[in-house]
Amino acid sequence: MPRKAREYPEEGEFVVATVKRIHNYGAFLELDEYPGKEAFMHISEVASTWVRNIRDYLKEGQKVVAKVIRVDPRKGHIDLSLRRVTQQQRKAKLQEFKRAQKAENLLRLAAEKLGKDFEAAWREVWVPLEEEWGEVYAAFEDAAKDGIEVLKGHVPDEWLPVLKEIVENYVEVPTVTIDAEFEITVPKPNGVEIIKEALIRARDRANKEKDIEVKFTYQGAPRYRIDITAPDYYKAEEVLEDIAEEILRVIKQAGGEATLLRKEKRIRKVKKRKK
């Protein structure tokens, strides 16, 4: 079970918790990411509507995503709320938790290869990476994308070779793909060749950038679709803007017209394994 580097959660933090004991006035929950820490959820924090029977909402052994509303480390008190968690926040937290589980499994594998126990791995790798990146899997993603050198100085050097092997084989680099259409016309006998050359030049120039992939698809005159895959949305938009400027410039010089068409900003998230 993945655990946080901190001893106590912070107010406003979302946590994964397991219901341990239920009473008429509230419930006690164990914090999955903070071993040995128990929290209390008053019945008024279970749901937005009046709760007649708390057992209609909570069951022993049930895992929930809750929001930390009060923390008193001196007394060891932690208060949680279920009603203050939106569906989107719940989904995001569960995704984060799954990523932490993946990171833990990978670190256990690395520790086994290095002949170390997980407690040593947690102290030497997990804690410093979480403190620097916020989550360990994000550090592994950066290492898969930019090279293991990004971890140098954060973890002992003896871990780098085995972590390099792990991230290259098991960590996928997240990417996004956006699409748009160009409407292009060149009223000349060789207009088709001019358009083709403009698209090829724009595509090849963009594809020279690291982790960028651009593809054009003929949609039927005068429309051409473009798909851009990049590490993140902002980079994809930047590439689209550069390509649009280049195409518009070349087509205008040739005496034609080009327009970028975007009815809406559509983003398709994909994951591409690093090769």
UniProtKB/Swiss-Prot annotation:
PROSITE patterns, alphabetized: S1 (PS50126)
Domain S1 motif: residue ranges: 12-83
Classification via SUPFAM superfamilies: eIF-2-alpha, C-terminal domain, eIF2alpha middle domain-like, Nucleic acid-binding proteins
InterPro entries linked: NA-bd_OB-fold, S1_domain, S1_IF2_alpha, TIF2_asu_arc, TIF2_asu_C, TIF2_asu_middle_sf, TIF_2_asu
Top-level lineage group: Archaea
Matches recorded under Pfam families: EIF_2_alpha (PF07541), S1 (PF00575)
Keyword Metal-binding among record annotations: no
GO MF annotation: an example: ribosome binding
Key words, A-Z: Initiation factor, Protein biosynthesis, RNA-binding
Family: Belongs to the eIF-2-alpha family.
Role, per record: eIF-2 functions in the early steps of protein synthesis by forming a ternary complex with GTP and initiator tRNA.
PANTHER family from the UniProt entry: EUKARYOTIC TRANSLATION INITIATION FACTOR 2 SUBUNIT 1
HAMAP family in UniProt: eIF_2_alpha
Summary of subunit composition and partner proteins: Heterotrimer composed of an alpha, a beta and a gamma chain.
Protein name, as recorded: Translation initiation factor 2 subunit alpha
